[in-house]
Amino acid sequence: MNQYKNFIMQFEDIVGNNNVLIDEPMKKHTSFKVGGPADLLITPTTLEQVKDSIILCRNNSIPYYIIGNGSNLLVRDGGIRGVVIKFLKLGDIKVEGDRVIAQSGAPLTNICNEALKSNLGGLEFACGIPGSVGGAVTMNAGAYNGEISQVIESAKVIDKDGNVFLLNKEQLDLGYRMSAIQKYHYIVLEVTFKLHNSEYDTIKNRIMDLNRRRIEKQPLEYPSAGSTFKRPEGHFAAKLIEDTGLKGESIGGAQVSEKHSGFIINKGGATAGDILNLIEFVQNKVMEKFQVDLHTEVRIIGEENN
């Protein structure tokens, strides 16, 4: 029974009839291609609609979850009770001098392309990261010795009470896969990056080089959520997993990638349960062998199947 159907008309008044989906399978909205239904999924088209939706949820004690591209997200098979607010249609990007300003739902690849067109360097490391900028800032995403903290100037955020304010780089308190946004449960609305002038060909060649390395080393041909585990201090997760003999290990349709042990992939027909069971199996085996605790980098939400 979807207890939030009574609020459909109110959400439609905020975001429009075409932007409210009922009992929507989350496997359509995550890069893992798994996940049960969300009671409601809405796609606001303005920041004001985001604010109004959050206030409606707060005033009626409706649980809500923000997602961008769903590329670092695992939704359990029982789905999500409450409302998913998807930032898909909040992707505006503008360039002002050496700054790039992007709404939270803008894919990192689009932001990189806009920076490239304007001969602005600094974001090359992010060009192959499949997520949206809001999620990237929230977890201080990084790759190839670069991370968001190196290029961000500020972020406009909203809190659970609907207050909108600006956080500068220091206030964002960005660390390894962490931020003040996670700590205080803020939601990113807009991000300003401060980049540097560079040569078009220099930027382009760096992007092409990093993308070539990704294609060579990562199992991009299968659904996944990127690196499954955070890097444990003093170790590399993929090496620990490989040295435990788990490369290629499978449970149901989930597999530790044979190409890169740091990735758990959906080899075909996996459930969220398969992936979660494999994550736990890997964690237990690595702990047994090396006494190292692997923490997931992927965000896990939703209900177990009854």
UniProtKB/Swiss-Prot annotation:
Q: Where is the FAD-binding PCMH-type domain?
A: 34-198
Q: Where in the cell is it found?
A: Cytoplasm
Mind listing the UniProt keywords for this protein, alphabetically?
A: Cell cycle, Cell division, Cell shape, Cell wall biogenesis/degradation, Cytoplasm, FAD, Flavoprotein, NADP, Oxidoreductase, Peptidoglycan synthesis
Q: Which InterPro entries match?
A: FAD-bd_PCMH (IPR016166), FAD-bd_PCMH-like_sf (IPR036318), FAD-bd_PCMH_sub1 (IPR016167), FAD-bd_PCMH_sub2 (IPR016169), MurB (IPR003170), MurB_C (IPR011601), MurB_C_sf (IPR036635), Oxid_FAD_bind_N (IPR006094)
Q: What is its EC number?
A: 1.3.1.98
The record ties this protein, via Gene3D superfamilies, to: 3.30.465.10, UDP-N-acetylenolpyruvoylglucosamine reductase, C-terminal domain (3.90.78.10), Uridine Diphospho-n-acetylenolpyruvylglucosamine Reductase, domain 2 (3.30.43.10)
Q: Report the GO molecular function annotations.
A: FAD binding; UDP-N-acetylmuramate dehydrogenase activity
Q: Which pathway does this polypeptide act in?
A: Cell wall biogenesis; peptidoglycan biosynthesis
Q: Is Protein biosynthesis a UniProt keyword of this protein?
A: no
What's the chief localization of this chain? cytoplasm
What cofactor is this protein dependent on? FAD
Query: Active-site positions, per UniProt?
Result: R177, S227, E297
Please give the GO cellular component terms listed in this UniProt entry: cytosol
One Gene Ontology BP term is: cell division
Instruction: List the catalytic activities from the record.
Output: UDP-N-acetyl-alpha-D-muramate + NADP(+) = UDP-N-acetyl-3-O-(1-carboxyvinyl)-alpha-D-glucosamine + NADPH + H(+)
Q: Which domain of life is it from?
A: Bacteria
Say yes or no: keyword ATP-binding present: no
The record's family statement is: Belongs to the MurB family.
Cross-referenced HAMAP family = MurB (MF_00037)
Q: What is this protein called?
A: UDP-N-acetylenolpyruvoylglucosamine reductase
Recorded name of the encoding gene: murB
